[in-house]
Structures are given as structure tokens and as C-alpha cells.
Regions:
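A short, conserved acidic/glycine-rich loop-to-beta-strand motif
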Residues: 2-16
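Secondary-structure boundary motif
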Residues: 2-5, 61, 84, 130
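Conserved nucleotide-sugar donor-binding catalytic segment
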Residues: 13-107
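C-terminal subregions of glycosyltransferases and related glycan-biosynthesis enzymes
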Residues: 76-80, 84, 89-158
Length: 158
């Protein structure tokens, strides 16, 4: 059970594990079995993919942007927007999703996705600059935004 708070809960987040039951990411200990944080900070805390469950009414309000000729926008862009609406509860040890990483998947083909979806990545990276508290990450996302602008310019030239 999650103890009450005055902030409205908009979703829950659980862990992923591989088919051999090894947890994806690093172990995070909590006396309560959960923490309340943002999707951006959760990425740094858990260091691995997570499985989100959002309230339907909030999820419907936050649509993924659509860019002609592109097929991808990082999901964290929307997860952050949902998190802006209320609290997200992250269960530190509860696994609800078993997974495997495929050779042709997003994690192993990041550069391909970035080059082919520069506007989708640009909206994500540019929004992350304001969300980050540490200068290192602000600079990282600023540079990634510039990289997206370069890829957009190269696509226009084709």
C-alpha cells in the first residue's frame, strides 16, 4: 500500500526484468518499497528501462507529436508531461514486465532512430534542457538538440 498524500497520483511505475528474472537496471532500496520522483530523475536512479502505468484520462490528454516523414518520439517526452500533472509512484522492486533486448531494437540502434527522426528527438531534447538541474545534463541535451538541428538540415537537403 502507498501512504496518502495531498498530490494527485497520475501513474505508477514498475520494474522490468529479463526472462531469467535479473532486474533491468540497478537495485534501488526503499524502506517503503517505492519512491516518488519524476521520470527524468527515475532514469538516473534506476539506470534501466521501467514500465509505466498511467491514468487513462491523463494519458489521453498528452498525445505524442506527429512529424511528417518521421516515426518516433522518445516516450520520456510524454512521460514527463504526464508527471507534470501529478505524482508518479515508482515501485523499487516490483517487476510486472519481462523483456529482452533485440538486435534491431531502439537501444542498439539509437543513432539510426536519431538520424531518421530528428524533429521527434529535438522536441524531447529541447524540453529536457529545462527539466535538468545539473549543468552537465543541460549541456548534454543542448548538444543533442544541436545534433538534431543538423540532422534536420541534412534531411532538407536530400
Amino acid at each position: 500500500a502507498v501512504s496518502g498524500s495531498n498530490i494527485e497520483t497520475v501513474g505508477f511505475c514498475y520494474r522490468k526484468a529479463f526472462f531469467d528474472n535479473r532486474m533491468v537496471g540497478r537495485e534501488v532500496l526503499s524502506n517503503d518499497g517505492y519512491i516518488i520522483t519524476t521520470p527524468t530523475d527515475a532514469g538516473k536512479i534506476f539506470c534501466g528501462d521501467l514500465d509505466y502505468v498511467f491514468r487513462t484520462d491523463v494519458m489521453r490528454e498528452k498525445e505524442f507529436p506527429i512529424f511528417p516523414g518521421e516515426k518516433f518520439v522518445p516516450e520520456l517526452y510524454i512521460w514527463n508531461k504526464i508527471g507534470d500533472e501529478g505524482q508518479l509512484i515508482f515501485f523499487t522492486e516490483k517487476v510486472i514486465y519481462l523483456c529482452e533486448y533485440l538486435e534491431d531494437g531502439y537501444s542498439r540502434n539509437f543513432s539510426f532512430y536519431l538520424k531518421n527522426n530528428p524533429r521527434g528527438f529535438f522536441v524531447f531534447y529541447s524540453s529536457q534542457i529545462c527539466r535538468e538541474t545539473k549543468l552537465f545534463y543541460k549541456v548534454k541535451y543542448f548538444l543533442r538538440s544541436l545534433q538534431c538541428i543538423l540532422y534536420m538540415a541534412l534531411r532538407i537537403g536530400k
